[in-house]
């Protein structure tokens, strides 16, 4: 399978990504094929507006129940907020993937 070359985020996360405050994203199985070492074009989900490029550092499986304060810190939010956001986006999904990245 070819590694994805694009990634989208809700526009509300753009400022944190650009400021380096958000350094991971948590996705479901449909987005687990990002490959470490590749660079992706990043755009807003709502408008499709490109706002940066990210280098994928790692892709690791994680269960929703294993999310902790460290993940929340990397997402620049509290653990309670992180879990709430994940449940809104991926209701009822236990198997997730942590994608770590850096802006290039």
From Swiss-Prot:
- What reaction gets catalysed by this protein? N(4)-acetylcytidine + H2O = cytidine + acetate + H(+); N(4)-acetyl-2'-deoxycytidine + H2O = 2'-deoxycytidine + acetate + H(+); N(4)-acetylcytosine + H2O = cytosine + acetate + H(+)
Q: Which CDD domains match?
A: ASCH_yqfb_like
Keyword Hydrolase present in the record's keywords: the answer is yes
Key word Hydrolase present in the record? yes
Recorded hits in InterPro entries, A to Z, give: AC4CH, ASCH_domain, PUA-like_sf
Please give the Pfam families that the UniProt record associates with this protein: ASCH
GO cellular component terms given for this protein: cytosol
Hey, what's the signal peptide range on this chain?
none
Where is the catalytic site?
A: 22, 25, 75
For this protein, what is the EC number? 3.5.1.135
Q: What class of enzyme is it?
A: hydrolase
Single GO term (MF): N4-acetylcytidine amidohydrolase activity
Please list the residue ranges annotated as the ASCH domain: 7-93
Q: Which domain of life is it from?
A: Bacteria
Q: Which UniProt keywords apply?
A: Hydrolase
NCBIfam families documented for this protein: PRK04980.1
UniProt similarity note: Belongs to the N(4)-acetylcytidine amidohydrolase family.
Q: What role is this protein assigned?
A: Catalyzes the hydrolysis of N(4)-acetylcytidine (ac4C).
Question: Could you tell me what this protein is called?
Answer: N(4)-acetylcytidine amidohydrolase
């Amino acid at each position: 399978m070819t590694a994805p070359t694009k990634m989208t985020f809700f526009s509300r996360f753009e400022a944190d990504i650009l400021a380096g405050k958000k350094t991971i994203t948590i996705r479901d199985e449909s987005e687990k094929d990002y490959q470490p070492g590749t660079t992706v074009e990043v755009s807003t989900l709502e408008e499709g507006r490109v706002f940066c490029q990210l280098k994928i550092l790692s892709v690791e499986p994680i269960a929703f129940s294993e999310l902790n304060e460290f993940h929340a810190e990397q997402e620049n939010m509290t653990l309670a907020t992180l879990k709430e956001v994940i449940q809104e986006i991926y209701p009822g999904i236990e198997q997730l993937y942590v994608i770590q990245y850096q802006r290039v």
